[in-house]
Amino acid sequence: AFAGILADADITAALAACKAEGSFKHGEFFTKIGLKGKSAADIKKVFGIIDQDKSDFVEEDELKLFLQNFSAGARALTDAETATFLKAGDSDGDGKIGVDEFAAMVKG
């Protein structure tokens, strides 16, 4: 799904680094997968993949399964990790993350 945007080796390394429950840190993950240095267009493409229901927002249930976008066998985020991730990205407080909020969070 991320071919041409992100390298498989970077994704594998990033997933390995947050395998343990409670170890997911979005900033570190975005850096490890190489997303931080990507263009706005590429970040928007990644957002489109994560936005599974195509609502133009990433909601809490999609964040919980965030890692599974990168590997089907990846773990779900814990409730605490999901809440922290949502809070970090949801700058307008509407309970979901839009594409501009996502881009701002990635660039961090």
Curated annotation (Swiss-Prot):
Q: Which UniProt keywords apply?
A: Acetylation, Allergen, Calcium, Metal-binding, Muscle protein, Repeat
Molecular function per GO: calcium ion binding
Q: Where does Ca(2+) 1 bind?
A: 51, 53, 55, 57, 59, 62
Q: Where is the EF-hand domain?
A: 38-73, 77-108
UniProt cross-references to Pfam families, sorted A to Z: EF-hand_7
Give me the Gene Ontology terms describing cellular component: cytoplasm
Q: Which residues carry this modification: N-acetylalanine?
A: 1
Detail which positions bind Ca(2+) 2: 90, 92, 94, 96, 101
Miscellaneous comment as given in the Swiss-Prot or TrEMBL entry:
Is regarded as an important allergen.
Q: Which family does it belong to?
A: Belongs to the parvalbumin family.
Protein's name according to its UniProt entry: Parvalbumin beta 2
Q: Which organism is it from?
A: Merluccius merluccius
Print the organism lineage: Eukaryota, Metazoa, Chordata, Craniata, Vertebrata
